[in-house]
Amino acid sequence: MQWRALVLGLVLLRLGLHAVLWLVFGLGPSMGFYQRFPLSFGFQRLRDPDGSGPVGPPGGPAWLHRPRRGTEGRLETPPEPGPTPGPGVCGPAHWGYALGGGGCGPDEYERRYSGAFPPQLRAQMRDLARGMFVFGYDNYMAHAFPQDELNPIYCRGRGPDRGDPSNLNINDVLGNYSLTLVDALDTLAIMGNSSEFQKAVKLVINTVSFDKDSTVQVFEATIRVLGSLLSAHRIITDSKQPFGDMTIEDYDNELLYMAHDLAVRLLPAFENTKTGIPYPRVNLKTGVPPDSNNETCTAGAGSLLVEFGILSRLLGDSTFEWVARRAVKALWNLRSNDTGLLGNVVNIQTGHWVGKQSGLGAGLDSFYEYLLKSYILFGEKEDLEMFNAAYQSIQSYLRRGREACNEGEGDPPLYVNVNMFSGQLMNTWIDSLQAFFPGLQVLIGDVEDAICLHAFYYAIWKRYGALPERYNWQLQAPDVLFYPLRPELVESTYLLYQATKNPFYLHVGMDILQSLEKYTKVKCGYATLHHVIDKSKEDRMESFFLSETCKYLYLLFDEENPVHKSGTRYMFTTEGHIISVDKRLRELPWKEFFSEDGERDQEEKFVHRPKSQELRVINSSSNCNRVPDERRYSLPLKSIYMRQIDQMVGLI
């Protein structure tokens, strides 16, 4: 009997020890047994057993390897398996709970990002964004106007580089037409500063002329100047005046006539090209320069339709929309028959692709953006059809990583640069302009995928306090180190917040605001970062800092802004200029239109007339309701995947 009692005692002791171990290591919403318990536990081991680096296939992330594609253009099976959530009491990973050990309850990501964002803090950040704009704008007016840009370090103005016509970085943008003032007009209105808006409009009318011996890039003049003039004109003539009284006494459509004058001076770019694709540059007085380059980028030639289309429909003159639409169709018809992709540089005379790289960044970005936004504004069915086909090709050939953003194994989704004909990887870098793409995905309702790509760019921002112009994801280091105050990450942050109302994006915006204040503010404004690591600066403040970066930051924190509350649907151009989406822009004021070959088509054959409810825009509640309610109160991306992304950019 004694040996039986001894055996029973040992069994009970063993069961008791198991119970204690289970209570210590197994309970809690974020804990679970891992295969190598008790040395490692948690949902996922994101590093090699020796802790030396992220788990992944030899030679780098699975992004290097082309995935198999399913029928919908997504991954049919994931790439090389990454770390897997461990078994245990919690099952799959949940939003915002501990990763890799460290106790029960919310983890570091949950604590930092998912707490309430108090109204007082929101108001403080809104005022900081407004103060940032005012500081830059006031210093431009005091030290630089009527020149194009402000040099914020030495407090002086900058115009075209007359001594070096080959300095395209400056001369493509600066046309000696008070660029920063023109570009900032609608930001003044959105911030409710009616007196300064009215003063600025009168200054533009009375002092700005396009009769200048300036050779400018057609794309830059269109999005920065033409787009701003049209936006400000629409604000002035809006009968509802949602931003306050922005009317101008005795206003006689002067901004619209100025926009027409500029567009007429840009039209020679579309002449004498065998493809209909425009020359990249024109002289505002003399037309296309005799030594003009026959090569242009896809975005530069194919991102004119929004501004040119608005102008045509306001004037009742089809010329501008026709030339812009012809250029889009010409580029579209040159896409690869095998992949459906476009390259980034084309010869306008031969239609030969000089640059065969296909990606989402420089050279292609706004081409895709304007296919969708042209449909939203004008309702032309062919624009939506082109966009849907392009998006399908992007998903099929550019997207790498696991199929779902918030589920499964493998690397996080990323869009890479490939050869337009083969779909094969061309390099291992991405550029900062690509950070616009999550915002575009929000517009089409692909919010889940947008969340992951945005998180990747935000992780890069966290590492450097800015976005390097080009980042090598294989080397985990910048290839091009400067940051010219670009708005793309801020834009996507704002649009994702509008879609999800998740406070995470307010925290992201606060991080960006504080980084800009800390690293870029100088004596007379905000300066380009020459080097994102050592934070050395260049003496330049580009106009898009006031027209986009400050605007999106302000709107992110201004919940009561008329943009969000007036009941009017708005869309932003690629330069951040606000345009109301209304019936007038979806109706052609002319009875005939031109087909691609220059012959006239009857309107009924050319134009699709969607009903208003067919057009989906960002402040449509039906789009925002696609996001699960859980996402409004928890992290938009599970902590396990946030940590994975942070590790993959070398942040941890």
UniProtKB/Swiss-Prot annotation:
Protein name: ER degradation-enhancing alpha-mannosidase-like protein 1
Region Disordered, annotated ranges: 50-86
Self-association and partners: Interacts with DERL2 and DERL3. Binds to SEL1L. Interacts with DNAJC10.
Protein purpose: Extracts misfolded glycoproteins, but not glycoproteins undergoing productive folding, from the calnexin cycle. It is directly involved in endoplasmic reticulum-associated degradation (ERAD) and targets misfolded glycoproteins for degradation in an N-glycan-independent manner, probably by forming a complex with SEL1L. It has low mannosidase activity, catalyzing mannose trimming from Man8GlcNAc2 to Man7GlcNAc2.
Residues that carry a glycan: 176, 193, 294, 337
A single GO molecular function term of this UniProt record: misfolded protein binding
The keyword Phosphoprotein is annotated on this UniProt entry: no
Topological type in the membrane: Single-pass type II membrane protein
Record organism: Mus musculus
